[in-house]
Amino acid sequence: MTNLELEKTANEIRKSIVTAVHSAKSGHPGGSLSSADIFTYLYFEEMNIDPKNPKMEDRDRFVLSKGHVAPGLYSTLAERGYFPKEDLVTLRHTGSYLQGHPDMKHIPGVDMSSGSLGQGLSVAVGMAAVGKYDKKDYRVYTLCGDGEIQEGQIWEAAMWAGFKKLDNLVVVVDNNNLQIDGTVDEVCSPYPIDKKFEAFNFHVINIDGNDFDQIRAAFKEARETKGMPTAIIAKTVKGKGVSFMENVFDWHGKAPNDEQYEVAMADLEKAGEALCQK
């Protein structure tokens, strides 16, 4: 896909995120919106996957370590064709298969159930290690939050991944610098994130995580890196695309009301129209 096609797709995914969270009357729009461009590139350009065969043996694997941004993952999976987009409005509803955190047993395209922060990287490292052991060509991707990496288990997993030279592993950190109760650097600063991963023998790439030129270049560089895992530190805007949500930590975990929903969708419709003029 061209960058313009990716931008248009990401905008549609953002619409779905806002719609799903509004319908649920709860959820996590901020981090879902900041990650939308990463999700889009992974599922529409980077990963070897087949929505018609979600359990394809040689598929690339994805672990959503920051499981609370499930609206972002679900919206991407629906846009990619894993299940009907119409199902997104059942998010968090009683009886729906689309609950607040990813469920690998019931949702097509989900490789790992997640939700308890800090655990996803360990799972991704295990998947990557098995791939190496079995001499498989698949790659493993995981998305972590910058607040999430305050968890110690993240760094145990990183240490082992670097030690084992898992060059089939790519860790993306959604660095929007906001978490549920404030800025990441004020709550418990993990900075400098890049130097920490480098200390554990990762190849590190710093990018603007809302810029497809930089996203594309980063994943290409990761594929070309041999003998060590890659960490992509993606600087993003929390609530990206919705004017009143951008860079506001209050939107970490709450749903827009009806009036706010209309404003958010108008923002995204306007963005879509602008993309059509390019």
Residue ranges of predicted features:
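Cofactor-binding active-site loop characterized by glycine-rich and histidine/acidic residues
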Residues: 17-21, 32-163
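Glycine-rich beta-alpha junction loops
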Residues: 68-69, 73, 176-177, 211, ...
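N-terminal capping segment at the start of a domain
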Residues: 10-26, 174-176
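Short acidic, glycine/serine/threonine-rich loops at helix termini
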Residues: 74-75, 103, 153-155, 181-185, ...
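Glycine/aspartate-rich loop-and-adjacent alpha/beta segment that forms the canonical ThDP
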Residues: 212-278
